[in-house]
């Protein structure tokens, strides 16, 4: 599999990723895809951050979720809850 990069996600902002959970799926909307400062000159990719919004009132734990998107395909993404706003919970994924 190709190493994921910011370019895989940049065109998907404000689009829904479906996370597999038990017998169903949860909707996570990608609300931000941003580059992070380069830390190592020999890094395999440029680091980046993704922020997802989930409108459920339930806080889901940090873990790897199998996410599906029409263009990105199915990928395992480790997300961590970082905030709550009026629209739901915000989750972050860091790729470095």
What is the meaning of each model-derived region?
Residues 62-96:
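Short, compact, well-ordered microdomains
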Residues 39-71:
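Acidic, aromatic-enriched beta-alpha/helix-loop junctions
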């Amino acid at each position: 599999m190709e190493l994921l990069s910011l370019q895989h996600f940049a065109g998907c902002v404000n689009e829904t990723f479906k996370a597999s959970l038990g017998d169903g799926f949860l909707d996570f909307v990608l609300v931000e895809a941003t580059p992070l400062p380069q830390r190592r000159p020999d890094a395999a990719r440029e680091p980046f951050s993704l922020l997802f919004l989930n409108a459920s009132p339930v806080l889901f734990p940090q873990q790897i979720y199998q996410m599906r998107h029409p263009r990105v395909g199915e990928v395992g993404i480790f997300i961590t809850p970082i905030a709550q706003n009026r629209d739901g919970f915000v989750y972050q994924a860091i790729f470095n």
